[in-house]
């Protein structure tokens, strides 16, 4: 749920299929975003109430959230605004996976996404996206163990994202404990992202 300066409107949630709280991303854990001006098209500028063509930076964390208690309040607010009709997802970058999943469980999401370093972003510092992060294969096992230890397997879904490129990657993620996978970059490239089709 973005800041109001990025055009967030709680009424839009009534139209949503789900609400994802973006806590982190595997290829830039703990860092904010950097959206290059060339990607701030007129359409993006209008949607986010930003000037077109100007670089945009986003903070590493939402300024309204200081910890899991604040996030739990926001999740409850979203559930109330949607009469509990849309699933709540938390997206975590693979860092301190076991501890982060245990903390995320306290916010009562429907699913937790673990994003490994193999994923990509169009809004991160080059050094971070190329040289940092935890491989997703290791992250899946840690996340599953955290859910198992808390007795939350089957109650909170574990979704893996980050570098899924083919059926073999899907099979490995499921075998290691993911309930589902999410594909971002690969599907965007298949659709010729950011270009007229």
Functional labels for PLM-detected ranges:
Residues 16, 33-43, 48-51, 60-69, ...:
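Signature of multi-pass transmembrane helix bundles
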Residues 62-197:
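Glycine-rich phosphate/ribose-binding loops and adjacent secondary-structure elements
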């Amino acid at each position: 749920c973005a800041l109001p300066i990025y055009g967030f409107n709680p009424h839009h949630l009534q139209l949503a299929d789900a609400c994802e709280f973006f806590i982190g991303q595997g290829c830039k854990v703990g860092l904010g975003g950097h959206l290059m001006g060339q990607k701030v098209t007129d359409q993006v500028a209008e949607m986010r109430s930003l000037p077109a063509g100007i670089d945009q930076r986003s903070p590493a964390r939402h300024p309204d959230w200081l910890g899991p208690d604040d996030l739990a309040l926001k999740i409850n607010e979203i559930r109330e605004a949607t009469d509990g009709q849309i699933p709540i997802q938390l997206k975590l970058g693979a860092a301190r996976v076991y501890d982060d999943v245990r903390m995320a469980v306290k916010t009562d999401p429907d699913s937790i996404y673990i994003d490994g370093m193999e994923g990509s972003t169009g809004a991160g510092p080059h050094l971070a996206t190329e040289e940092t992060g935890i491989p997703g294969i290791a992250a899946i096992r840690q996340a599953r163990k955290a859910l198992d230890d808390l007795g939350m397997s089957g109650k909170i879904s574990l979704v893996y994202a980050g570098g899924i490129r083919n059926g073999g990657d899907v099979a490995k993620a499921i075998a290691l404990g993911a309930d589902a996978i999410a594909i971002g970059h690969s599907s965007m490239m298949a659709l010729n992202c950011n270009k007229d089709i």
